[in-house]
Amino acid sequence: MSDQAPEILLAHHLKALKLPTCLREHHKLARQCAAEGVDHIRFLARLVEMEMIDRERRMVERRIKAARFPAVKSLDSFDFSAIPKLNKMQVLEMARCEWIERRENAIALGPSGTGKTHVALGLGLVACQKGLSVGFTTAAALVSEMMEARDERRLLRFQKQMAGYKLLIIDELGFVPLSKTGAELLFELISQRYERGSTLITSNLPFDEWTETFGSERLTGALLDRLTHHVSILEMNGESYRLAHSRARKAKTRP
């Protein structure tokens, strides 16, 4: 057996076992451990730990990509002082994701620009980091996709996909009224997810104005009954979060 044969065989096995980090790092780590007098058991432990850490990072990246977030935003970058009515401790408690494990819902209410989407994205990011499947969409886009899927006779498959997320974030509910068919399709999806998965909705409308979006008091009442059975309400009333930060940035750039 040539001197290169064991190295070639090892590389082949590591590729077959799908251990790219071990393949990439084993030479460097072996030299480092030899210099430090580290035995083979500790060398293997370090190498496997590197693989595990890298694998988890890649899995988180895949979950974030699959979620289709419009932007990746964390709760760490959210200025809670700009929205004093928002309960910071409630949001940080929700970041533990136990409410998702319990299949509960969340609704963020407040005027446009108060940071509802940022908080929703932050909670979605944390869920991805904790190994949970997340989907993000706007209410208008979701309804449009469902109507298109219905016309193409793949609605059941699409609904199954949406119902399968541990957390489904529906942004901007109430920005535009829904058609009768669109409202019924959205109600059907939320009903399918009821006590099977968590749904986080952001809306610029208080509950008593949701009928304007759904066009039916009966449908709105039934929807709210399902959403609010187990729910966390995030009150986000106040001056526009985006406007306040825009003013702050301009103030910093002034001579």
Task: Please describe what each predicted stretch is.
Residues 1-22:
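Charged, compositionally biased N-terminal leader segments and the immediate start
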Residues 9-12, 28-32, 77, 105-109, ...:
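Short hinge/gating elements
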Residues 19-71:
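Interdomain "pre-motor" coupling segment immediately N-terminal to P-loop NTPase/helicase cores
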Residues 55-110:
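Extended interfacial segments that mediate partner engagement and assembly in macromolecular machines
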Residues 86-164, 211-213:
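Conserved P-loop
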Residues 167:
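Walker B motif beta-strand of ABC-family P-loop ATPases
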